[in-house]
């Protein structure tokens, strides 16, 4: 994985900064997410029933499971910021669940930097236009604007910014 410096980040606005590895969304992952979130709707956890009673032909991942995979996608696909000491979620805007992720599908994230702003002495707030693609599908699973905070040592703040 390549690296960027804090000083380089603003010049990358409008560019795709990363594309993650493919992640397989299997029934075990879906079941564990259902247990963690107490969301046991049949379309997620009952393959036989979902095959008969849902329009999907089987179980599908929770939309929020797909969304939560952004962290893993970030780690596998985004450049490391050299000066970063910690990363934080700040929020999400315009989250849209576009297509269901069928059990056994593979998904990956694409990250386009759309905004960044230095705040205070030690934070860079970034916004990424994120698309989660489903392998061999035309429509994405989801799109969102993901806002993150890159924390860094104040002594590493780029000069003049």
From Swiss-Prot:
Which InterPro entries does the record cross-reference, listed alphabetically? HotDog_dom_sf, MaoC-like_dom, NodN-like
Instruction: Keywords in alphabetical order, please.
Output: Nodulation, Plasmid
User: TM segments?
Assistant: none
Write one Pfam family the protein is assigned to: MaoC_dehydratas
Q: Which Gene3D superfamilies match?
A: Hotdog Thioesterase
Describe the location of the MaoC-like domain by residue ranges. 9-133
- Coiled coil start-end: none
Matching entries from SUPFAM superfamilies are given as: Thioesterase/thiol ester dehydrase-isomerase
Function noted in UniProt: Involved in the production of the root hair deformation (HAD) factor specifically on medicago.
Q: Which family does it belong to?
A: To the R.meliloti counterpart.
What protein is this chain from? Nodulation protein N
Q: Which organism is it from?
A: Rhizobium leguminosarum bv. viciae
């Amino acid at each position: 994985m390549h690296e960027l410096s804090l000083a380089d980040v603003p010049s990358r606005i409008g560019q795709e900064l990363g594309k993650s590895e493919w992640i397989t969304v299997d029934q075990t992952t879906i079941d564990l997410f259902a247990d963690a979130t107490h969301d046991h709707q049949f379309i997620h956890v009952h393959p036989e029933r979902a095959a008969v009673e849902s329009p999907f032909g089987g179980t599908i991942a929770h939309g929020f499971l797909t969304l939560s995979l952004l962290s893993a996608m970030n780690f596998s696909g985004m450049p490391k910021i050299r000066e970063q000491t910690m990363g934080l979620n700040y929020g999400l805007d315009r989250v849209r669940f576009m297509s269901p992720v069928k059990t056994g599908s593979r998904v990956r994230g694409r990250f386009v930097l759309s905004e960044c702003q230095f705040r205070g002495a030690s934070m860079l707030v970034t916004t990424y236009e994120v698309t989660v693609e489903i392998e061999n599908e035309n429509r994405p699973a989801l799109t969102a604007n993901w806002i993150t905070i890159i924390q860094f040592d104040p002594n590493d703040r780029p000069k003049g910014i």
